[in-house]
Every structure is written in structure tokens, then in C-alpha cells.
């Protein structure tokens, strides 16, 4: 919709129509600290309308063949790809990430999400067994669950929203999605493409607002039997409490405190640039980012020197600048939270090698109030420190030495999270051995963030419940039924 007083005004998308809201909240451009957008402050009334629309659309959408639904998803992908630059510009402005990253990762992956699930939904099979001595045959069928409640985070806004919408739609469900109120623009833009792609009214409803108001209304609604959430552990605990009385299906993808383990036989020419990227990509605002780096003592000094030098080459600045590697953090509150971890580390006697409080950040006048922070490397810190145990979710990483394989495995596992890890070594036997012992849902060896969407994604321990991916997402968004026929 058109802006008012130069502000972009978003509207909810319910039953195929854009609808205004009675109240709005401000959304800020992270690179300037200025309000540039107003987001609906939705609540129970908007959720009731969305549930009604989704329930009414469900019988028709769920009865379509997988091939018909696949065609619609592919059409959404085509339209999104045609608008890639427009979406990338919007994502960068709304989230603070570099335009280069939005162009090369966020929006292309969003396109791929629709195409991937459009294809994978055509290749599922069912089980069948026979009990000849009883004259019985057993087989399974899967059916869509119904109305899917989807809650996505602010760090990869469209990327993770489509990672939920696409499999839910492909399986035959209808959707009520709630993006983060901090990054709602590309979700709103996506709504404009749905009708063009042939998505029937009510199949996808997107309701904007805060977690305590609209999020809780969605999660607690008795006619929304399934919730898929990506975000923080405290919010997941609240979702679990609200869902328990209704026995809802839950998929919870939460935080991480991801270790990188670098053995003395690692190829540092490959390891160092990859570990800088895994530590600071997207301002460190990726649940898979590395925030604990364990380096074998014999190469610790060399690694640290080269790692700090490489980190300092990552330029922080205006997200649209093609030479910039790190944009702005999501909000002023989050920036202060990340900075507070560095202050606490200093109070504990840690050393800061580069970044916050050490190097000077130079920004244009217009961006002085933006939420920028230099990539920061911390050493001389204990494993029990908050910087080594809590998810910081910013451009901060800790580098510590280790002696033996057994020691580093124990230390790497000594946190409540278990999402991802990386292992660097030229010893093939070692990387297999260590990967199996790490309490992580994903382990990369001699690489980072290479994803195969057919395989499970998700974490152990406090990093979540369930897995996402081709088969796992299909299983989550469907209910299985066993049928026995006596002949």
C-alpha cells in the first residue's frame, strides 16, 4: 500500500485481501535508527478472522492433487525470482543485512524453498505390510493436519518464513503466518504475489504484530492444531505452555552456542576465511553462527594472529555498499545486549583482540544512529563464562586453546545447546569420530553452511524439538493413519 507521511504502511493479508488494523507499531531502519515503516499491531480479532478463512479454504486446498499444489508453488517461485532485486533491496533495508547477502542468499533461498517443496511433495511413498496367516494387509496414508500456525524470526525473514509456508502448503494445509514485527516487509510483499500465482483466498494468511498479542492468540487458538516456530528458547517455553492444553503438534527450532574445533592438521588457508564467515556472516545473527572456537595449542598463536587479521578485513558499514561485509544489527536493544556481553567478558578478565572498544568504527553522518558493531574476537575466557555458554547472536566470537581430542569434545558439549558444530582436520578418521561424539544436530567438517535440503535440519538439547527438511517437514505437516484390510 502507499506510504503515509513517507512511511510504508503494512496491512494484514486475510482471506486473499489486504485489511487495515486499528493500531500500528513502528518499525525501524537498522542502518539509520529511523522509523520508516508501520506494522499492524494485530490481536485476537485478526487471528479469529484468519482462522475462519483458513478453515474455510482447507477442504478445497487439501483435496487438490499434489501435482496441482506443486504447480501453484512453482508459480510463486517464478514470480518471486522475477522480483528478486526488489525483494533483496527491501530485505536489506528492513533487517540491516548487506544487500549482497540478501541478493545471493536470502531471496534465492526463498525461491528455492518453494521450488524444492513443490518437487519433493511429488515423491513421497507409503508403507505396506501383509499378514498372510491372518489374511490381512496393512498400509499407511498421510493427510494434511489442517490450519498450520507458523511463526518466523527476524534474522532471515523471508528465507525462514518460506521454509515453513512452502512445505505446509505442499502437504495440503492452510496457513496462518506471523512474521517478526521487526522485519515484516518482505512477508507483506510476498502476499502480493500469492494471488497472481493462483493461491486461493484463505490458503495463506499473514497476520502482523507482536508475540505477546498476536503470537499468543495464534498459538492458543483451539482450531490451530499445529505450530512451527523458529526463535528464542524463552518464547518456545511460552509456546509449549500455551499449546499443552490442546496437545498441538510442535516444531521448535531454537538457538545455538555452536563450536568450531580446529585441530593442528587443519588447512588454515581454508579454515580461517571460512571461520571468519561462520562467526560474522549476517552480523552473527544466524542460529548456525560460530561463537566458540577451540584451537589446538600447537597452532593457537598462529591461528589467532591470522584470524584477527582476517576479521579486521571485514568492513562494517552501509548495507547497500558492495564493499561492506557486515551491516547493521536488528535493533538498538539488541545492539546494547550484544555489547553487554563484551563488557561482561572484560570484567571477567578476558582480552579483546579486535572490534568493540578496540577499533574505531567510521560511519557517514546519516548512519551515526544506526545499530552497527565491529566484529569482535575475545580470548582468555573461561568455559563457564556467559560469553561461552549463552547465545549472543551478534558479531562476537571467543577463541580458546585445547590439548586433546577427548578434552575438546567434552568442552564443546558442555553447554545446554546442540544445534551445529564445525570440525577442521585433514584426518578423515578423526572428523568422522569427532562428528559422531558431538551433541549437535548438524556437524560440518572442513566447511560451513553447505546445506542439502533433503536431509534433516534441527538441533539437540535446548536447541529445539523436531527436524525440518523434505521428509521431516512432510511428516510434520501431515498426520499418519494405519489402515488394515482383512480379505
Curated annotation (Swiss-Prot):
Where in this protein does the record say Phosphoserine is found? 362
Reactions catalysed, semicolon-separated, are: 2-aminomuconate 6-semialdehyde + NAD(+) + H2O = (2Z,4E)-2-aminomuconate + NADH + 2 H(+)
User: Mind telling me which SUPFAM superfamilies this protein's record contains?
Assistant: ALDH-like
The residues that the entry says bind NAD(+) are: 209-215
Transition state stabilizer (site feature) positions: 155
What positions constitute the catalytic site?
253, 287
Determine the domain of life of the protein's source: Eukaryota
Q: Pathway of this protein?
A: Amino-acid degradation; L-kynurenine degradation
Q: What is its EC number?
A: 1.2.1.32
Disulphide bond pairs: none
Q: What is its main location?
A: cytoplasm
Tissues showing expression: Highly expressed in adult kidney and liver. Detected at lower levels in fetal liver and kidney.
Record GO cellular component, one term: cytosol
A single Gene Ontology molecular function, please?
A: aminomuconate-semialdehyde dehydrogenase activity
Keyword terms, alphabetized: Cytoplasm, NAD, Oxidoreductase, Phosphoprotein
Kindly report, in one word, the top-level EC class recorded for this enzyme: oxidoreductase
Q: Which Gene3D superfamilies does the entry link to?
A: Aldehyde Dehydrogenase, Chain A, domain 1, Aldehyde Dehydrogenase, Chain A, domain 2
Question: Which BP terms from GO are recorded?
Answer: 9-cis-retinoic acid biosynthetic process; L-kynurenine catabolic process; retinal metabolic process; retinoic acid metabolic process
The UniProt record lists the keyword NAD: yes
Q: Where in the cell is it found?
A: Cytoplasm
Pfam families found in the cross-reference section: Aldedh (PF00171)
Q: What does this protein do?
A: Catalyzes the NAD-dependent oxidation of 2-aminomuconic semialdehyde of the kynurenine metabolic pathway in L-tryptophan degradation.
What family does the Swiss-Prot or TrEMBL record give for this protein? Belongs to the aldehyde dehydrogenase family.
Question: What protein name applies here?
Answer: 2-aminomuconic semialdehyde dehydrogenase
Biological source species = Homo sapiens
Amino acid at each position: 500500500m502507499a506510504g503515509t507521511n513517507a512511511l510504508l504502511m503494512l496491512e494484514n493479508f486475510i482471506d486473499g485481501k489486504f485489511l487495515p488494523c486499528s493500531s500500528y507499531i513502528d518499525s525501524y531502519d537498522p542502518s539509520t535508527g529511523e522509523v520508516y515503516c508501520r506494522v499492524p499491531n494485530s490481536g485476537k480479532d485478526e487471528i479469529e478472522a484468519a482462522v475462519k478463512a483458513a478453515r474455510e479454504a482447507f477442504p478445497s486446498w487439501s483435496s487438490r492433487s499434489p501435482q496441482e499444489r506443486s504447480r501453484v508453488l512453482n508459480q510463486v517461485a517464478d514470480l518471486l525470482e522475477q522480483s528478486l532485486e526488489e525483494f533483496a533491496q527491501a530485505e536489506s533495508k528492513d533487517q540491516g543485512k548487506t544487500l549482497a547477502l540478501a541478493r545471493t542468499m536470502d531471496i534465492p533461498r526463498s525461491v528455492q524453498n518453494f521450488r524444492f517443496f513443490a518437487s519433493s511433495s511429488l515423491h513421497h511413498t507409503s508403507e505396506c505390510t501383509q499378514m498372510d496367516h491372518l489374511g490381512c494387509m496393512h498400509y499407511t496414508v498421510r493427510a494434511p493436519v489442517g490450519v498450520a500456525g507458523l511463526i518466523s524470526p527476524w534474522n532471515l525473514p523471508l528465507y525462514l518464513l518460506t521454509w515453513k509456508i512452502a512445505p505446509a502448503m505442499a502437504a495440503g494445509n492452510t496457513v496462518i503466518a506471523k512474521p517478526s514485527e521487526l522485519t515484516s516487509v518482505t512477508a507483506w510483499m510476498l502476499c502480493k504475489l500469492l494471488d497472481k500465482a493462483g493461491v486461493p483466498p484463505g490458503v495463506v494468511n499473514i497476520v502482523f504484530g507482536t508475540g505477546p498479542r498476536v503470537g499468543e492468540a495464534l498459538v492458543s487458538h483451539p482450531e490451530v492444531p499445529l505450530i512451527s516456530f523458529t526463535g528464542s528458547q524463552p518464547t518456545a517455553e511460552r509456546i509449549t505452555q500455551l499449546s499443552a492444553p490442546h496437545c498441538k503438534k510442535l516444531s521448535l527450532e531454537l538457538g545455538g552456542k555452536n563450536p568450531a574445533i580446529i585441530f593442528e592438521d587443519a588447512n588454515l588457508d581454508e579454515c580461517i576465511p571460512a571461520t571468519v564467515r561462520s562467526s560474522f556472516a549476517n552480523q552473527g545473527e544466524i542460529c548456525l553462527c560460530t561463537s566458540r572456537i577451540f584451537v589446538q595449542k600447537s597452532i593457537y598463536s598462529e591461528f589467532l594472529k591470522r584470524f584477527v587479521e582476517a576479521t579486521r578485513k571485514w568492513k562494517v558499514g552501509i548495507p547497500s555498499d558492495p564493499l561492506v561485509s557486515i551491516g547493521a544489527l536488528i535493533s538498538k536493544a539488541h545492539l546494547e545486549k550484544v555489547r553487554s556481553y563484551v563488557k561482561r567478558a572484560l570484567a571477567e578478565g578476558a582480552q579483546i583482540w579486535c572490534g568493540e572498544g578496540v577499533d574505531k568504527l567510521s560511519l557517514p553522518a546519516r548512519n551515526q544512529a544506526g545499530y552497527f558493531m565491529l566484529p569482535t574476537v575475545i580470548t582468555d575466557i573461561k568455559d563457564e563464562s556467559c560469553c561461552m555458554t549463552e547465545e549472543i547472536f551478534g558479531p562476537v566470537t571467543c577463541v580458546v586453546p585445547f590439548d586433546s581430542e577427548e578434552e575438546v569434545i567434552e568442552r564443546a558439549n558442555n553447554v545446554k545447546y546442540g544445534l551445529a558444530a564445525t570440525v577442521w582436520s585433514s584426518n578423515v578418521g578423526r572428523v568422522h569420530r569427532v562428528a559422531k561424539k558431538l551433541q549437535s544436530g548438524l556437524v560440518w567438517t572442513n566447511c560451513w553452511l553447505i546445506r542439502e535440503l533433503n536431509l534433516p535440519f534441527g538441533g539437540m538439547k535446548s536447541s529445539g524439538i523436531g527436524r525440518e527438511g523434505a521428509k521431516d517437514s512432510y511428516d510434520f505437516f501431515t498426520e499418519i493413519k494405519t489402515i488394515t484390510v482383512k480379505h
